[in-house]
Amino acid sequence: MQNTAKKATLPATALAALGVVFGDIGTSPLYALKESFHAAHGLGIQPENVLGILSIIFWCLMLIISIKYVAIVMRADNNGEGGIMALLALNLRKAKIADNKKIYMIAIGFIGASLFFGDGIITPAISVLSAVEGLSIATDVFDPFIMPIAIAIIVTLFLVQKHGPAFVGKFFGPITLVWFLSLGILGIHSVIQTPVVLGMFSPHWAIQFIYHHPIMTFFVMGAVVLTVTGGEALYADMGHFGPVPIRLAWFFVVLPCLVLNYAGQGALLLRDPAAIENPFYLLVPQWALYPMIIMATMATVIASQAVISGVFSLARQAIQLGYLPRLSIKHTSESEEGQIYVPFLNWLLLIAIIILILIFKTSSNLASAYGLAVTLTMLCDTILVAVFIYSAWKWSLPKVLILIIPFFILESVLVGATSLKILSGGWVPLLIGAIAVTILMTWKRGRELTFAKLEHDTLSLDLFVKSIGNSVHWVPGDAVFMTGTPNVVPHAMLHNIKHNKVLHQRNILVTVVIEDVPFVAPEERITTETLAEHFFRIKIFYGFKDEMNVPKALMQAYEQLGLEYDLMHISFFISRDRIVHSVGDGMSPWREKLFISMQRNTSPVSDFYQIPTNRVVELGSQIEI
């Protein structure tokens, strides 16, 4: 994907990145400062308090986004790709950690990924609600319609997902640029009237606020975290745009405009403390209120689209790495490989978002649910990056600790602050995260047990090939057996002999191997092995972001083996495993039932590997775990 970024000019790529990478963090001014003061119950809106909270916001943006993500985390790339799954795969490949201890690192990666799924539910709900709530500033007439309008926008957004964002996507960058410039202009207009607000850049205001209000600071931090939501996106989308355009957009457009807008809202509060009701929209001149509401709604839809696309992409990576069951994945663009649509996840997200809006009703209520997911994800990133720096960059442990501990302490404080809101909404991301982690861990463990059972109970392939001789009837044609255990005889082959009493002239065992890299070079795609006159073994290697097309890869394999390739003379034999519970070591009964249920509902192998259905023969088998 980085090739696309390289072909385009740097400013054009930075503009495109604005619409995808910064949509989430760009909509934070709609609610972040308001929630920071709401969190500080009873704290007067005096100048020292306004400047103190603004200073905390500014330095959180600088420390967490500018230094941690932009300067450090974005250097921890997996062959150009970013995101928590890519970082986990990179660490599993590079870190010299005992297998029995890798489970802890996998758990951290799973927790971070699971919370991102939660983010995909909470972000559209809070963003769209906060934008539409601007209508209540214009007139009370709209008050009863805020929720229905927000739900209608969300439903429309999810209905068009199957068509992909390609058509409207080209407008995302320019619209988001106008949005950020609007934020900056509104801020400048207010700051000029009350320039004393620029004192927020001095850290002494933050230190003074923390010193005089230590308990209140803890509550305020739980809302200040809303200003850094979307920081993960800078890293997660790095593979699409490259680090340079993202850094360019951040330092030259996003950061200045965000800081100016927060300063402008603070200046407004210094002039009129009553504006705390909704400092963002009260910053807007009356004549520009409706255009700004429309612009804010467009910005939140773009932010939501970016998060939804991120969830689809993360799910695809998890599926290909073997952490999630196969789901149906549709490609919505012929030219852009990364534009995908996952129907099951699409409708699941839509239902969950509507339920959230109906339960919480306002963006202020949802803010409690939002912060905890963000802070925990950031903490997971910090831990995994520390492992990466130690193992890949070969830094000494003291040096790593000196770099990482300040971020770890800051984010631990943010986690603690947002944890205070568990009862008022923080339970939402925890519940979503717990469900997602359970699914990820159960599927991974279930697959391990299944493959171990197959390896243990099935005949060795080498022994089978040596002993088969001329005891079976050979029929013309090629039989391709898809198998995850290349060293044993596939169940489908055994069933073919048992029921049909035949073997094909050419029996080809194909195993798909997913590497811990985003993409595998075409020349490294295939390894082939001739086992005997009638038997061949092929391994096809893909990265976790590669397009998987087995028939296409087989053309290359046949060429290496010196065989004639004709898809219409190839039969693909696939074993449809039926998993059943057995007494003994393994998983707890409820996890086995969950795994069996997921196994039954996986997308067909033929769809996943793009094998024509008219060339597929499915044979059932039963495996006890």
Swiss-Prot record:
Could you tell me one molecular function GO term of this UniProt entry? symporter activity
Q: Does the keyword Nucleotide-binding apply?
A: no
Q: Where found in the cell?
A: Cell inner membrane
Which InterPro entries does the UniProt entry name for this protein? Answer: K+_transporter, K_trans_C, K_trans_N, Kup
Give the superkingdom in one word: Bacteria
Per the record, membrane topology reads:
Multi-pass membrane protein
Family, per entry: Belongs to the HAK/KUP transporter (TC 2.A.72) family.
Q: What protein does this entry describe?
A: Probable potassium transport system protein Kup
Which species is this UniProt entry from?
Answer: Acinetobacter baumannii (strain SDF)
